[in-house]
């Protein structure tokens, strides 16, 4: 039993000496060359990233070349599909342009018609703004709103014809009077 105890106590002493030796050598190496080791690791990482990206691109090019060489029919079909899609998009765009041109033409025709109506109403001596509402009323099918509203000539005026707000006549509790002349204190000097 004593032998087993001696061998167990001897083993940890050897292991601890080995760990101490390893610790001192690694510690001294890091203390001496630590920054060099850190920078070299960073440099190796960057170089590895660059090379791996280039290798991936090179492999992809080789695969694309192999696929194109093996299946030229697929490439031709892709190009035809792409051309058909472009043609379809161009046709849709042309249709939209035609619709827009037609809409602009209709708006221009409407403006021209309104200008002609304004000119005619001005020649007759009527207000052109009142006529701008007539085309909208004509377009709406339904009961005429003009029959519901009284005409301007049929209405009773709100005030008498001789009403002048600056004269002070015409009724009401408030009337305008000109201010007095002269200083407000009542005397000169």
Curated annotation (Swiss-Prot):
Bilayer disposition of the protein: Single-pass membrane protein
Entry's Gene Ontology BP terms: cell redox homeostasis; cellular response to insulin stimulus; cellular response to lipopolysaccharide; cellular response to oxidative stress; endoplasmic reticulum unfolded protein response; ER overload response; ERAD pathway; establishment of protein localization
Post-translational modification summary for this protein: Truncated SELENOS proteins produced by failed UGA/Sec decoding are ubiquitinated by the CRL2(KLHDC2) and CRL2(KLHDC3) complexes, which recognizes the glycine (Gly) at the C-terminus of truncated SELENOS proteins. Truncated SELENOS proteins produced by failed UGA/Sec decoding are also ubiquitinated by the CRL5(KLHDC1) complex.
| Bias kind Gly residues: ranges | 159-173
Its GO CC terms are: cytoplasmic microtubule; Derlin-1 retrotranslocation complex; Derlin-1-VIMP complex; endoplasmic reticulum; endoplasmic reticulum membrane; low-density lipoprotein particle; plasma membrane; very-low-density lipoprotein particle
Q: Which UniProt keywords apply?
A: Cytoplasm, Endoplasmic reticulum, Membrane, Phosphoprotein, Selenocysteine, Transmembrane, Transmembrane helix, Ubl conjugation
Q: Where does it primarily localize?
A: endoplasmic reticulum
Where is the PTM Phosphoserine found along the chain? 140
What the entry lists under Pfam families is as follows: Selenoprotein_S
- Give the region (VCP/p97-interacting motif (VIM)) as residue ranges: 78-90
Q: What does this protein do, in the record's words?
A: Involved in the degradation process of misfolded endoplasmic reticulum (ER) luminal proteins. Participates in the transfer of misfolded proteins from the ER to the cytosol, where they are destroyed by the proteasome in a ubiquitin-dependent manner. Probably acts by serving as a linker between DERL1, which mediates the retrotranslocation of misfolded proteins into the cytosol, and the ATPase complex VCP, which mediates the translocation and ubiquitination.
**What protein family is recorded?**
Belongs to the selenoprotein S family.
Q: What is this protein called?
A: Selenoprotein S
Native source organism of the sequence: Homo sapiens
Lineage of this protein's species?
Eukaryota, Metazoa, Chordata, Craniata, Vertebrata
